[in-house]
């Protein structure tokens, strides 16, 4: 897979993640129940900030870019995957599908961002 394809996957990830949090926010406001235990406003804000940094990463020097990517990978792995795996409780999730979707979307993000970063390391 070339870096253009990987770049498209990363854009798809952020679109999915932000959309998931927006749907969760709408559900909270209409049904008083979120998709996951993550606060949807916090989730949307964090994902939007990371997406903005991703969009600007082409103009960044290598070291700051790597620091941001490593921080992103760490935070999404711990808060977006492991937290959901460890803390599953039916009252914190709309359904098992929403629980699984949060884990799947964030796993896709870690994989796509990680692969894109590796592909950009000069040989």
Regions found by a protein language model. Name each.
Residues 66, 79-100:
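Membrane-helix boundary connector in multi-pass membrane proteins
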Residues 15-19, 36-58, 70-77:
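Core segments of alpha-helical transmembrane spans in multipass integral membrane proteins
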Residues 1-18, 108, 112-123:
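Cytosolic juxtamembrane helix and N-cap/initiation of the first transmembrane helix
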Residues 22-32, 80-89, 118-122:
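Juxtamembrane "helix-exit" motif on the non-cytosolic side of transmembrane helices
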Residues 33-41, 91-102:
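Non-cytosolic membrane-interface motifs at loop->transmembrane helix junctions
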Residues 68-77, 99-107:
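Hydrophobic alpha-helical segments of small multi-pass membrane proteins
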Residues 34, 61-68:
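Short, aromatic-rich membrane-interface segments at the entry and exit
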Residues 1-6, 22-37, 93:
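Short juxtamembrane and helix-loop transition motifs at transmembrane-helix boundaries
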